[in-house]
Amino acid sequence: REIADYYIDTSLMSTSTLKENVLNIFLDTPSDSMTISCISFGFKYGVPNEADLVFDVRCLPNPYYIPELKEKSGLDKEVRDYVMSFESSQTLQTKLFDLIDFLIPQYLHEGKSQLVIAFGCTGGKHRSATFAENMCEHLSKNHLKARVLHRDVNKDKK
């Protein structure tokens, strides 16, 4: 103990409290922070194994069937505008924002430091990419550490 830089008495400590103590010592981020990854994917390529939450947005109109949008992706403004032009898309997005805003403090309370939110559509190119981008923007505006990954957005390109 005399030569230790840190000493943690774990005799009456839960594992989550130990985790919080260790993170507070060795990480620059406070224990109430979380890294959130928003992933878009195509169901035809499989659900990401690392996903904590998976949302299926195939219920929304598909830009794939609009000739001028087919070759674009949810990273393009025209596609995002099209996807979000429907009341059903706007309602779903609002409900998902509300759900995630509710869940994050619950996960933080349980000591979760990483959260992976996955959005899936048929090919992972249009609707899921739009929703992943929008969720990442929403989380960032709320001062949360969020990043976006588009797993399948380029899979069908030749």
Where are these regions (language model features)?
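Short beta-strand-centered segment that lines the nucleotide-binding/catalytic pocket of NTP-utilizing
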Residues: 144-155
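Post-Walker A helix-loop "phosphate-sensing" segment adjacent to the P-loop in P-loop NTPases
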Residues: 136-146
